[in-house]
């Protein structure tokens, strides 16, 4: 199958954290051969549809809901949806003549990966977190390959299947630019993942109100998420703080490259993008992530010296302002953090995954 057209189906839905690493992989498949066809399977959520449409990919939908953290009755009801979701997935895979199925974790992956196994289609899973989620642990035994970002996650899977390669990052993040200054100011980028984070939003608002140093030092770009956008925008307006407030940044590669300092969640995709761009960061892990994987991710980066971690339970405007002022008063430390972030990047994750996928498909011919 070397050099031949391949039809790829990717189970990746819900949030940008699941979507963007898969999009990076999909784009590289299509860059190598324009005839390669990629279909995403997702939930039909507005943000997901918007991201995929913006990136130029088609999406099919299956009816499935999460199980972890839903309560006993809801979990049992949602388990009952799985057989139908597997059947729906099998129909999509047949209709697309799928040669390869990629699962990215989350509750969309198991039905699609199981359907691929039943149809004897090659299947791989991507696990970008330091502690694998339940979905990938469940389908790990039937996956042909398991791609990891953290070496410490290896013991959750069969050793022969595991490849530690990093997290795919879109090619746009590798285009070098210099940190942008607006009116002589550095750029502070704030985002709480693709859906935003109310706790981070509130802390940044309070920090900017309280800290004249922050207001004088930074031009602020703040991705709020759709739900919290109007509240945050109104709060800045009432306080007279000049901030660029947007619900979602489709041009994140350009904006992140231009940032001097970043305040963000610690999803695996975000951490990979920060490393590629060599950005120092203040990380606020999402406290309700399955198996607390965001804190594990953040601590791993903190140990390298590339980030400062503030737990959400400890996050206030005063604490955030203190950390930001401390970093900006020691530019040499900020530079060291950026250098250590850059040193942790893995530039060949996408290429390694694609080569492994091609080897798998060639082995079936």
Task: Indicate where each model-derived feature is located.
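Active-site-proximal region of nucleotide-activated glycan assembly enzymes
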Residues: 36-37, 58, 117-176
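Donor-nucleotide binding loops and adjacent catalytic segments primarily
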Residues: 46, 51, 55, 178-262, ...
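Conserved nucleotide-sugar phosphate-binding/catalytic loop shared by glycosyltransferases and other
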Residues: 5-13, 34-81, 226-228, 313
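A short, well-ordered alpha-helix in the C-terminal region of glycosyltransferases
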Residues: 333-347
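C-terminal alpha-helical cap of glycosyltransferases
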Residues: 346-365
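Glycosyltransferases and closely related glycan-assembly transferases
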Residues: 88-101, 109-124, 137-141
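Structural loop-to-beta junction motif characteristic of Rossmann-like glycosyltransferase folds
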Residues: 57, 121-122, 260-261, 278-286, ...
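Acidic donor-binding loop of glycosyltransferase active sites
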Residues: 98-100, 257-271, 279-280
């Amino acid at each position: 199958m070397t050099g031949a057209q391949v039809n790829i189906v990717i189970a990746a839905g819900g949030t940008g954290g699941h979507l963007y690493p898969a999009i990076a992989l999909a784009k590289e498949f299509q860059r190598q051969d324009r005839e390669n066809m990629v279909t995403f399977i997702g939930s039909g959520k507005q943000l997901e549809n918007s991201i995929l449409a913006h990136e130029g990919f088609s999406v099919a939908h299956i009816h499935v809901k999460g199980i972890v953290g839903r309560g006993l009755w809801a979990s049992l009801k949602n388990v009952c949806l799985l057989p139908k979701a597997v059947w729906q997935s099998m129909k999509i895979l047949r209709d697309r003549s799928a040669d390869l199925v990629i699962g990215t974790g989350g509750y969309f992956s198991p039905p699609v990966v199981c359907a691929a196994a039943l149809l004897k289609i090659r299947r791989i899973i991507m696990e970008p977190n330091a502690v694998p989620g339940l979905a990938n642990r469940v389908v790990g035994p039937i996956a042909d390959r398991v791609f990891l970002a953290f070496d410490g996650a290896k013991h959750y899977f069969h050793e022969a299947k595991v490849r530690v390669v990093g997290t795919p990052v879109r090619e746009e993040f590798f285009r070098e630019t210099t940190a942008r200054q607006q009116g002589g100011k550095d750029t502070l980028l704030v985002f709480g993942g693709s859906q935003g984070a109310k706790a981070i939003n509130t802390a940044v608002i309070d920090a900017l109100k309280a800290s004249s140093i922050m207001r004088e030092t930074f031009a602020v770009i703040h991705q709020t998420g759709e739900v919290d956008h109007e509240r945050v925008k109104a709060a800045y307006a009432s306080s007279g703080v000049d901030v660029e407030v947007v619900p979602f940044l489709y041009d994140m590669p350009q904006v992140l490259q231009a940032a001097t300092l970043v305040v963000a969640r610690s999803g695996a995709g975000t951490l990979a993008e920060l490393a590629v761009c060599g950005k120092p960061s203040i990380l606020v892990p999402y406290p309700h992530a399955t198996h607390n994987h965001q804190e594990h991710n953040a601590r791993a980066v903190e140990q390298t010296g590339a980030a400062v971690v503030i737990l959400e339970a400890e996050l206030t405007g005063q604490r955030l302002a203190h950390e930001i002022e401390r970093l900006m008063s020691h530019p040499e430390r900020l530079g060291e953090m950026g250098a250590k972030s850059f040193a942790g990047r893995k530039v060949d994750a996408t290429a390694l995954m694609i080569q492994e996928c091609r080897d798998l498909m060639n082995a079936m011919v």
